[in-house]
Structures are given as C-alpha cells and as structure tokens.
Amino acid sequence: MDGPIDAQGGFIRSRGMKFPKNPEIIKGRVRKLLRGNAYEDKETNAALRVVREGDVVLELGGGIGYMSTLVATKRPIKSVHSFEANPHLIPYIREVHAANGVRNAEVTNAILGPRKGTADFYVRDPMLGSSLEVLEGEVDPPSVKVDVLNAKAVFKDIKPNVLICDIEGAEVDLIPQLPLKGLRAAILETHPQWIGPEGINTVMRAFMDAGLAYYHRGSHGKVLCFRTEW
C-alpha cells in the first residue's frame, strides 16, 4: 500500500517503492513529493510509457535512486546502469536498491565526458541541488573531485538502448557528445533556466540527428521524450 510512512517507521513509500528515511537526503520538498506519490512525476510517466521488457537503461544523474528503482521494479528490464556525480548519494542509492530487492542495477560515482579525467563537482544543501557549475552569486562553494569516464567507451561496454538523463544543465554540453544512435528511446529533464533556448535546440538537434524523434505522449514541460518510432 502506498502511504506516507512504512509500518516499521524506517521507510517512506512512494508508488510501491521503499525509500529509507535519511534526514540528510529525504527532507523538505523531496519528502513531501515522495509521500504524495508525485516525486519525478513527469519522468515517471515518460519511463512507464517507453521502457520495455529486456531494455538496458543508462541513467545519467542517479539522484536518490528513484528512477533506477522505478524501471527495475515496474518493468522486466535487463539492467539499469546509473552514473551519479555526488559521492554522498552513492550509499543511499544502493540502500534504496537493496530495500526494493533490485539486483540488476549498477551505480557508479562518475560522470561521462569526451575523455577520461576528473572534474570539480559543487556540493550543496539540499544535495540534489549540487552540480558541475558554480551558480551565480556563489563564492568558493565546497567541491569534490569526480571521475570523468569516456562516454563512447561506456556506451560501447553497456550497450544501452534507453537513456534517462537529469544532470542539472550539463545536458547542453554532454548530450551532443554521446553516441546516441544505438538508442531506442530517451528521457531528458532539461533546464531552460540555465541553458536557454539555444541550449534546448542543441539538445533536441542531437537526438534528431541520431534518428530519434520527439515523442509528444512522453513529453511534458521541461521533460522531453524521444523515440526512434512511435
């Protein structure tokens, strides 16, 4: 039964999934949306429309493990591979997977890029507001070094056919560099407040050039969905 709090007091339940109560991560708006079964609502609806049996899902921006747990528990996928830059979220994502009996998910503390290396990742409170960029008005925000993995090598190794991406504005730089032609579907949360209309056009053009078309039934507001065929 979906509801605010697990009977044992250790979890919040959302859409049938269990999320350990961690006051450093599950708080404020995130907690409220989870309890109301409304967390990542647009992405959830898109994923349930396009993810199919046997899919290999690549997720960029693992967050609290919500989307990876959703696709692994609601659809008989082959596997889901999540890449999350924030090292403080990795243990929690694994807790969520374990709590929900997910055994076909892999979590990596890294981001993808055109070549291997490292990058500065700026950690904020709340954690889900952390990003690769210094925000306007910030002065010397705390940061950690995060590994950058070669995107083409990762795609070649995992061979995903579905991409789910929410990387806080970094999509405008990363998406055009990804080998998207092997994908059947993609779900992308855009951040127009940071990347502007030119950035949105750049991202959409990259998917269209790879043979994916805008899928209106899975798209809503800032969440864009693409498929090779409807």
For each feature predicted by the language model, list its residue ranges:
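Phosphate/nucleotide-binding beta-alpha loop and adjacent structural elements of enzyme active sites
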Residues: 1-230
